[in-house]
């Protein structure tokens, strides 16, 4: 089974106040039933009235964290996609508030890989952050945020890393 087929027919809500980003997602995800929303209000209305398999949320301009709260409450996996809110603080907040991935818009062309990783992890009962961590290694963040980027929230990152290791060990036992 080609990994792409996991996305076939999935209902995905993409929310961004930049129309060119929404247009790019439409072009990149033709296998999905992609619904787009340019505002918090429109996205909130859609989230509360329609079923979705995944959501892709910008942070700035559309109150992405408000939408993340709704998606999390409805058990819809949420991928945060951002340019202006690309920071260690927003990464930590996204994880803590229930997002399953956090991507810089420069990774938009690889969105199929990230969404597929999320669906595979969900299907296998694994933590989607493990695949994310593999695709965007620490060196990626060090180049953008400096070598000490984890220092301000050291306890969080130690707990996060330990959680990934524990989940990995548990999934290996099941195999």
What kind of region is each of these model predictions?
Residues 5, 19-36:
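Two-component/phosphorelay signaling modules centered on CheY-like receiver
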Residues 9:
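Phosphate-coordination loops involved in phosphoryl transfer and adenosine-cofactor binding
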Residues 14-17:
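Acidic di-acidic motifs
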Residues 19, 36-54, 62:
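Acidic, metal-coordinating helix/loop segments flanking the phosphotransfer/catalytic sites
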Residues 24-29, 46, 70, 93:
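Alpha-helical interaction/dimerization surfaces of two-component signaling modules
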Residues 56, 60, 68-71, 75-89:
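A short, hydrophobic beta-strand element within the central beta-sheet of small alpha/beta folds
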Residues 66, 85-104, 109-113, 117:
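Alpha4 helix (beta4-alpha4-beta5 surface) of REC/receiver domains from two-component response regulators
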Residues 120-175:
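C-terminal output/effector regions of signal-responsive regulators
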């Amino acid at each position: 089974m080609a990994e792409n087929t996991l996305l076939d027919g999935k209902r995905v809500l993409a929310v961004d106040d930049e129309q060119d980003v929404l247009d790019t997602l439409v072009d990149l995800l033709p296998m999905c039933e992609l619904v787009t929303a340019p505002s918090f209000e429109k996205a909130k209305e859609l989230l509360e009235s329609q079923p979705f398999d995944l959501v892709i949320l910008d942070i700035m301009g559309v109150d992405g964290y408000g939408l993340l709260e709704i998606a999390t409450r409805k058990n819809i996996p949420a991928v945060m996609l951002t340019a202006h809110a690309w920071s260690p603080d927003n990464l930590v907040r996204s994880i803590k508030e229930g997002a399953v991935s956090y991507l810089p818009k420069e990774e938009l062309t690889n969105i199929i890989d990230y969404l597929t990783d999320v669906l595979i992890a969900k299907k296998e009962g694994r933590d989607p952050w493990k695949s994310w961590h593999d695709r965007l290694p620490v060196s990626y963040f060090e180049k953008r945020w400096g070598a000490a980027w984890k220092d301000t929230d050291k306890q969080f990152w130690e707990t996060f890393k330990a959680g990934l290791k524990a989940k990995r060990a548990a999934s290996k036992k099941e195999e």
